[in-house]
């Protein structure tokens, strides 16, 4: 659409029915691998990478198209939209802070050992890692840009365990995540484990499906 308008000589802001529209490209890919170890015991792994770039009319992608991380289907030690971008951490006294915790680039990995307990009840031990980043510097969100220098420290890490009840056509899932490392610095913690307390490192989630 923007290309057609360019051919027609419209070199300024692009509009559709009188409204300016967003211009961006976005893509993501997800890889999953399952391996039966023995009996009803499985090793399941997942890797996801996604990126987006705004251009033309837009300086940023629409909010609904930006990446976020955390929650029942992500890094389970952290609730949804409480990580990133990068090492940025919004003011904790701002109830709307989670609006700022989105990014242009997402990297996430999960590995899970699934085992049968009894009947249709299964258990799982898992580890999750990842974060989101900005591809452009944002003065309002310092530390949010993806850089090679801070990449390792920016990766959030969590572990945990859960229960799965398999009713043949649906799986009910409960997970308790335990945070091991957050991307934002904690002046009271010097080592890799930098959660303020064990209680604050916990995340509980209920979900349907794997």
List the predicted regions and their residue ranges.
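C-terminal outer-membrane beta-barrel translocator/porin domains of Gram-negative envelope proteins
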Residues: 1-115, 126-145
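Outer-membrane beta-barrel domain signature, especially the mid-to-C-terminal portions
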Residues: 5-8, 138-156, 187-197
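Repeated loop/turn-to-beta-strand initiation elements of outer-membrane beta-barrel proteins
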Residues: 38-43, 119-123, 165-173
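Short glycine-rich, acidic/polar surface loops and turns
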Residues: 110-112, 156-164
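Outer-membrane beta-barrel "beta-signal"
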Residues: 165-170, 196-210
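Flexible, small/polar- and glycine-enriched "cap/hinge" segments at structural transition points
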Residues: 128-130, 135, 160, 164, ...
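Residue-level signature of outer-membrane beta-barrel architecture
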Residues: 33-35, 113-115, 165-167, 176-178, ...
